[in-house]
Amino acid sequence: MEDYDIPSPAPQIISLTPSAPRGMPPAIIEQASGSSRYTSVGSMGSSSSAEHFPLLHAYNSSASSQARIRTGTTPEPGSVAGASWPASCEAPSASNPPKQHVWLIFGATGTIGRHICRAALERGDVVMACSRNIKTTVAVPQEWSDRLLTSSCDVRSRQMVKECVDRTVQRWNRIDVVLNCVAIGVIAPCEEQEEHDVRAQFETNVMGLFHIVQTTLPYLRLRNRGRYIVFSSIAGILGIPGLGPFSGTKWATEGFVESLAYEIEEFGGKATLIYPGTIKQDETQDKISPPWRHFLIKPLSNEYRDTPAEHARRMILWLGAHRTTSVEKIGEIIWELAHSNNPPLRLLLGSEAVETMREKLRQTIEEVEDWKFLFTGDADDG
């Protein structure tokens, strides 16, 4: 294995009890203090700076709007809160009741992963929850105990991934939904990223997904159905200075999953990329973990101070006070997505993700139009 030192995390206590009533703080999971050098979690999106990515203006311009969004009194722009799924999606409904699904979730102890686990269990599905070094005490209602398995899994190891897949099939004879929200990132300018850190990010974020797909796809293909739900990031929409290799892994994920979606459509398979905005963390976690715990922050050299390369570091610190996307709502949406007959290839959750994608597409179209006349023919005019 590469030089990728990951001290064992402190034991976690995972509570998958049903959701608290609306308006009450969700009592979901309490994680003991102590952190790894890297944490396998659902990757966070990062919005843009005023100089390089105009999206930040929208959030700094109206403190009152932010307050309404954070308190839930106003549906978040761009989210599906208060809106129905498009009819073409054929989401679960009274006329299209959901069938029980078997979930295989990688990154199940991250903020996003465990909320999805809970959403699936609350609605009658069964879950194999996998995470690296998952030394946990799982507290679940008695009626859920026969619908939840847990397993330690480092996605860089193809063998460990295969063992999780085999256990799932042995227990429930099938896999309906494969979900991956494992990702690591290192914050530093491209020039100053260590080779072993870059390799670690690609081994986890790209090769880990490759292992997951290759070991699960035969079972999905055999049944002519199934779906992949893969968490991307705003860093998969645009390159973020200070997160070059991490953005690279997310762009690789983009191409891989989109290609996969075309390949598996022939036998009824579906694949969806998820782009979350800045995720609200668990209330208990906020008290014991820094908002940047998702990334390893490297010291910045004098050469890169006060340059765009410092953007990612500033944004991670900024996120601590500007998280607007409800992770509980994400769990509910992902469950509905998994039970929809015609899911989209891309699903953006939160106004930051939506506006960042719009801005990226706008800039790309403008650039194409500005430069398209430079070369207009396919043959050499001599």
Segments and roles (model prediction):
Residues 144-159:
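Rossmann-fold cofactor-recognition segment
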Residues 213, 249:
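Active-site helix of classical SDR
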Residues 123-138:
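Conserved glycine-rich Rossmann-like NAD(P)H-binding loop of the short-chain dehydrogenase/reductase
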Residues 109-110:
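Conserved glycine-rich cofactor-binding loop
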Residues 233:
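Residue(s) in the substrate-gating loop at a strand-loop-helix junction
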Residues 266-343:
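SDR active-site lid
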Residues 189-190, 194-199:
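Substrate-binding pocket helix/loop in short-chain dehydrogenase/reductase
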